[in-house]
Structures are given as C-alpha cells and as structure tokens.
A protein has these predicted regions:
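Function-dense linear segments that define catalytic or interfacial modules
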Residues: 1-16, 24-27, 37-41, 110-202, ...
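Acidic, glycine-rich active-site loops and adjacent beta-strand->loop/helix elements
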Residues: 6-11, 55-59, 124-125, 238-242
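Glycine-rich and small/hydrophobic secondary-structure elements
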Residues: 18-36, 230-247
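Short active-site loop/helix that positions an aromatic residue
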Residues: 59-68
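Gly/Pro-rich turn-and-neighbor structural signature
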Residues: 60, 91-109, 113-118, 238-252
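Terminal amphipathic helices with adjacent charged low-complexity linkers/tails
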Residues: 64, 77-90, 125-149, 208-212, ...
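A short alpha->loop->secondary-structure connector
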Residues: 67-75
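Extended, well-ordered alpha-helical scaffold/bundle regions in very large, multi-domain proteins
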Residues: 197, 204-252
Length: 252
C-alpha cells in the first residue's frame, strides 16, 4: 500500500522549480501505469492500495478518480479518516465546513463501484503508539502495515473440516490452525524479499494472517442456509475458535 498524503496538492507551486505540482492523483496514475507493466510470476498483475488523508487538498479528485471504468486499474483506493472527522459527521457539522459534501461523495462512490474504501486511522494506530505510525494497508485492506512491512497470508479450507455426520471437526480445525500459524511463520524465514528493508521489517514484526476459505461449502455440507442465524452463529464460533487457537499457538 501507498500513502499519498505527503504529496502536495495539485496546482501548488514547487519552490525549487516554480512550476505547479501535478497532485496526488496524477502520481497515483503514474504508479498504476508503471505497475501495469509488472506481473507477479509472469501471470498475475500487480495490485496495490492507494491511501489519501481526508484533509488532503486533492481529496475530491481522489474520491472520483476511479468512477470512470478502467481508470487506475492496478490500485484499490481508500480515504484515511480521523475520529474527529467522524465525530463531526455523526453529531452534525457546520453547513459551510465542506465535510458533509466530502462524506456524501465517499458514500456515492462506494455505492456506485465500491470505491473508495474507508480506513479509520486513529483506530488502526490506537495500539501502535510506541512505534512509527501506520499510514496504509495491503491491497485488500485487511492488514494495516508500516513502511516496508509485509504480511504473509494463508487460508484454512473450512469445507475440509466437516465430518461425515455433518458437524464441525473442532479437533481437526484446531490442528489446522496451529499448522497454518507455524507454516506462515516459517515462510517469513524462508522467503526471498525483494529489498533488504522489507526483510528487516518483516522479521522485526513477523505479521501473519491466518484466514479461512470454503465457508459456503461448509454450510452446504452442514445443511445450513446461507445468511441464516445458524450460519452467522457458526461463522462467529469458527472464527473465535481459529483466533483463540492461533493466538495461543503464537505464544509457544
């Protein structure tokens, strides 16, 4: 992920040249065009997250930059909002502040094509005040990351953890969660990082993501209707279980 918050607003004067700055969105487009020429393993196109703070001068253009289908195709985009901004929106703001207008644009864009997303930066940094602040996330937004930090992700196939009687095999699920955690931690040691800074930060914080897949198939095997109360309760119980097992294993 990239935070474009330090890029000066479009049209502001660059002191060293006397020329107007291109702005955050033009730099975002430049990055997207460059990444379009790079693939992962020769097949998968590059993916990134572009983040801009809610108070940046280019925020309106940023919110609208993907409304045209096919533009900036190699980035998801998210607006970094603060607790103060949300407080003002929830509790009413001055009509002339412009905040409600910006908020309405975010909501409209999310309704039209799912972008921009929202990152609650104060919440993200609430437990990380002793180290450098987090400004961005990985491409899908599930893992907030510091500069040069990386996170290894893996998923447990839930459908493979339903026994022949149509019940969750909790013991087998626990074993898989423990194995997944160890596996991902070993990947940090064994994988090759593109630059030394990434390797150093990854081994410093050792972030991993133990996720799941196959939830819908699990429901089919268990005879649960998707979206039912039973299905929602199952999802909550499974994730609490995987989380608890993973946390306990990480302390050993």
């Amino acid at each position: 992920g990239f935070s474009f918050g330090r890029i000066r607003g479009k049209g502001s004067t660059v002191a060293s040249t006397g020329r107007p700055a291109p702005g955050a969105v033009n730099v975002l487009q430049l990055y997207s065009d460059a990444i379009a020429r790079v693939t992962q393993a020769g097949m998968r196109p590059g993916a990134n997250m572009g983040v801009l703070p809610i108070d940046h001068p280019d925020i309106e253009q940023f919110i609208d930059c993907k409304q045209t289908e096919g533009s900036i195709t190699n980035f998801n985009i998210s607006v970094a909002v603060t607790d103060q901004f949300m407080h003002n929106i929830i509790h009413g703001d001055r009509p002339d502040s412009g905040r409600q207008f910006i908020w309405d644009k975010i909501i409209d864009g999310a309704w039209r094509n799912g972008e921009p997303g929202i990152l609650f930066m104060d919440t993200i940094n609430n437990g990380a005040l002793h180290v450098e602040p987090i400004e961005a996330t990985n491409p899908c937004g599930e893992v907030p990351l510091r500069p040069y930090e990386a996170c290894v992700l893996g998923s447990i196939n839930l459908a493979a953890h339903v026994n022949g009687d149509g019940f969750v095999d909790w013991a087998e699920l626990a074993a898989s969660a423990r194995t997944m955690l160890r596996l991902l931690d070993h990947v940090i040691e064994k994988q090759a990082s593109p630059i030394p800074e990434i390797e150093a930060e990854q081994k410093r914080y050792r972030k991993i993501g133990v996720g799941v897949m196959g939830y819908a198939d699990m429901l089919i095997k268990m005879g649960y209707e998707y979206g039912s109360e039973a299905a929602l309760d199952l999802a909550e119980n499974v994730m609490h279980y995987v989380q608890d097992i993973s946390y306990n294993e990480s302390m050993h």
